Every structure is written in structure tokens, then in C-alpha cells.
Amino acid sequence: MLEAYEKAEPGPELEVTDRVVVSFDDRKKSRHRVTTERGVELGWFLERGLVLVDGEILKCTDGTFVRVCAADESVSDVHSDNTLLLTRAAYHLGNRHVPLEVGAGYLRYQHDHVLDDMVRGLGLHVAAARAPFNPENGAYHGTGGHHHHHHDHE
């Protein structure tokens, strides 16, 4: 079984040899076991709270690199040219701590008929879909990235 304990920094020197396609719920697990597209078992053991983002690369202990891809899953899509309505919907969904993908003219969340009814009640159209789900990291959530500035504590 392949094991990964960290993400790789992207770069042209990386030779990605395999990939895993996983849901958002699986990408937010700090410890998880999956089968790669080549049929190899992979276990990742990452820092708690770290969420794998579509396209990120895992560095395996044997020196190989595996790309993480977001799987299609059951989502609700909300599209509108009305920025105020979309902003209101994002506010109400965020107030319920719903993981939310925010894009130009759309919102996407994991399908939930109660949330769909709430968003419709705000005057928006909701469409059920199967698509990759890539929600925003929370404002207070660490991304696991590098700390690029220095603190002088003298």
C-alpha cells in the first residue's frame, strides 16, 4: 500500500504517475484509504483539519506522486445574474455553516432538499446536478500552506 503524509508543492519537476478521484467528504478526512485509478491502494495520513483540494498532489513515501481529483457528486447549483440575491443566499447558507462553492454568477452546495427550499424561498432557482464540489475553505480554516513572512520576536 502506498502511504502519503504530506502534499507536494506543485512544480514542473513533479512526475505524477497516478490519481485518485474522491468526494469532498473524503477529501476532508485526515486519514483515508482509497484505490488509485491504476488499482493501487493508497492511504493518506495528513494534518487534522487539512482539506485536499481538486488538483493537489500527494507525495508518497516511495517517492511517487498522486494527483487528487474531485469526484462528481450530488450537488445543488444556484445560478443568477442578480448579485444581491446570490449574496443573500450565500449569507444564509454560510450562517448554517454549509460548505459552499462560490463562483462568478453561481453557488454550489451538497444537495439537500431543505436548503434547496430555503434558497428557492429567497427567489432563486435551484437545479440538482452531478458535478465536482470544491467549496471555499473557511476564513478561519488553515489551508496547510506555507507561512511566507517572518515574525521578529526580539
Curated annotation (Swiss-Prot):
Signal peptide bounds: none
UniProt keyword annotation of Cytoplasm present: yes
Biased composition (Basic residues): 144-154
Keyword Chaperone: yes
Molecular function via GO: nickel cation binding; unfolded protein binding
Region (Disordered): 135-154
Location within or outside the cell: Cytoplasm
GO annotation (BP), single: protein-containing complex assembly
GO cellular component, one term: cytoplasm
Main location per the UniProt record: cytoplasm
Annotated keywords: Chaperone, Cytoplasm, Nickel
Family assignment from sequence similarity: Belongs to the UreE family.
Role description: Involved in urease metallocenter assembly. Binds nickel. Probably functions as a nickel donor during metallocenter assembly.
Name listed for the protein in its UniProt record: Urease accessory protein UreE
